[in-house]
């Protein structure tokens, strides 16, 4: 492996200390990495003059791997761009939880294993999310974790209808509904009372958020199902959909949010021999 991109979150990696160490380790292993920002920074933010940054959109088509430095949010953000190009992703945690990261910032020496091919690639299911208004598709995105349909007004509830393959699965009033992948089952979905699902499982997890109903329950559906969510006809409030914690899209009465398995899969690079349950136990001890 020779062509590698490093994408540090400048607000997490202060003075780029972690990425500087990674650059040296990779160079010593015979890899000449390119440095790119994962997103645009504030105009007033001054990048260090001794580091040369390239444009991500120019480098991504020619790379073999993206190494992302940050928390889970940064990794989720980069997963979309990398997946659309079919490029594997390796996360280095500089955040709090870092559930999706393969390495901690104290384990950078393991990056030298990339030069000798001592790694595996793990595929993760993604979801396609669209919003249809009348006959027009107004919103489309992919997600690795989840699509969240939620209320837009504090101290109010939103009434949502959820269907699987056109058949009513649940109708609930509350703060909203999470539609998650197995990867996303350990994120917001878990906080809302959803189950932990192994990432290799083929499921779509539907979890109500603070439902105002005694019988409200999570649904673990097959990944073959097409899930639709819309506000019920007597709803008096707007709702919003957000994908992997990104910018929210405002929903009107009559809009239909459709969530289904994507043909795209995120490829995560693994350098360590550990099970999913090892990760769960280790990460949640931090909380």
Label the predicted regions.
Residues 15-16, 73-78, 186-191:
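Short glycine/serine/threonine-rich phosphate/pyrophosphate-binding segments
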Residues 1-65, 106-122, 131-141:
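ATP/NTP phosphate-donor binding region
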Residues 11, 72-74, 97, 183-185:
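Short glycine-rich anion-binding loops that position phosphate/pyrophosphate groups of nucleotides
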Residues 143, 149, 154, 165-168, ...:
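ATP/nucleoside-binding phosphotransfer catalytic cores, i.e., glycine-rich phosphate-binding loops
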Residues 85-103:
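Short, acidic/small-residue loops that bind anionic groups at enzyme active sites
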Residues 170-175, 179-215:
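Gly/Ser/Thr-rich active-site loops/lids in small-molecule metabolic enzymes
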Residues 97-175:
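Catalytic core of DAGKc-family lipid kinases
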Residues 68-72, 80-81:
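N-terminal glycine-rich "phosphate-gripper" loop used for MgATP/nucleotide binding
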């Amino acid at each position: 492996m020779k062509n590698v991109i490093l994408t540090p979150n400048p607000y997490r990696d202060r003075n780029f200390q972690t990425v500087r160490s990674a650059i040296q380790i990779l160079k010593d292993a015979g890899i000449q990495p390119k440095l790119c920002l994962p997103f645009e920074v504030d105009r007033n933010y001054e990048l260090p003059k001794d580091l040369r940054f390239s444009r991500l959109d120019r480098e991504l088509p020619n790379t073999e791997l993206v190494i992302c430095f940050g928390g889970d949010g940064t990794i989720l953000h980069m997963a979309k761009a990398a997946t659309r190009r079919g490029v594997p992703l390796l996360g280095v945690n500089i955040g709090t939880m870092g559930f999706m990261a393969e390495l901690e910032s104290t384990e950078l020496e393991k990056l030298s294993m990339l030069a000798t091919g001592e790694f595996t690639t793990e595929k993760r299911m993604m979801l396609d999310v669209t919003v249809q208004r009348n006959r027009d598709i107004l919103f489309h995105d992919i997600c690795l974790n989840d699509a969240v349909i939620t209320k837009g007004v504090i101290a109010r509830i939103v009434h949502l209808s959820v269907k699987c393959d056109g058949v009513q699965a649940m109708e609930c009033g509350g703060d909203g509904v999470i539609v998650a992948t197995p990867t996303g089952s350990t994120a917001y979905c878990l906080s809302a009372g959803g189950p932990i699902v192994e990432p290799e499982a083929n499921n779509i997890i539907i979890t109500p958020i603070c439902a105002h109903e005694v019988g409200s329950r999570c649904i673990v559906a097959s990944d073959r199902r097409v899930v639709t969510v819309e506000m019920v006809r007597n709803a008096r409030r707007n709702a919003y959909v957000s994908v992997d914690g990104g910018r929210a899209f405002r929903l009107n009465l009559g809009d239909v949010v459709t969530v289904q398995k994507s043909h795209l899969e995120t490829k995560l690079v693994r350098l360590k021999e550990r099970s999913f349950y090892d990760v769960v136990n280790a990460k949640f001890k931090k909380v």
